[in-house]
């Protein structure tokens, strides 16, 4: 029997994911690729972390746009952190921040979802 109580969605957590942008952008007009990629990353983070407030790091935006509007990277390794919102007038108590994760020299093959332990 599963205990009712605190949901895992209300905890602070950090995870690393590989996002296949090529699959999500298939059939998209060339001149809309990079803006759509940013929207898809935001949508992925909302679904993965269960928060509606998603903030993208500047380095992530630069990585998406690094090869221009048409040539978006096929896959990206991202780190998504769910954090508490300290502002009193915030409508959500949690928000997610998405940053670029380091890609190992071997490439993205075989990397799954990785849970990062916080050092607070």
UniProtKB/Swiss-Prot annotation:
CDD domains: Ribosomal_L31e. GO terms for biological process: cytoplasmic translation. Gene3D superfamilies: 3.10.440.10. Keywords: Ribonucleoprotein, Ribosomal protein. One of its GO terms (cellular component) is cytosolic large ribosomal subunit. InterPro entries: Ribosomal_eL31, Ribosomal_eL31_CS, Ribosomal_eL31_dom_sf. One of its GO terms (molecular function) is structural constituent of ribosome. Belongs to the eukaryotic ribosomal protein eL31 family. This is Large ribosomal subunit protein eL31. The gene is RPL31.
């Amino acid at each position: 029997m599963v205990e009712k109580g605190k949901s895992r969605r209300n905890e602070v957590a950090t995870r690393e994911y590989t996002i296949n942008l090529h699959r999500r952008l298939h059939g998209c007009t060339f001149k809309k690729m990079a803006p759509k990629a940013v929207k898809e990353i935001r949508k992925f983070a909302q679904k993965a972390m269960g928060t509606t407030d998603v903030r993208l790091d500047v380095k992530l935006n630069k990585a998406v746009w690094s090869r221009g509007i048409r040539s978006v990277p096929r896959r990206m390794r991202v780190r998504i952190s769910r954090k508490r919102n300290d502002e009193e007038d915030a409508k959500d108590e949690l928000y997610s921040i998405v940053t670029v994760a380091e890609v190992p020299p071997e490439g993205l093959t075989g990397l799954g979802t990785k849970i990062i332990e916080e050092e607070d």
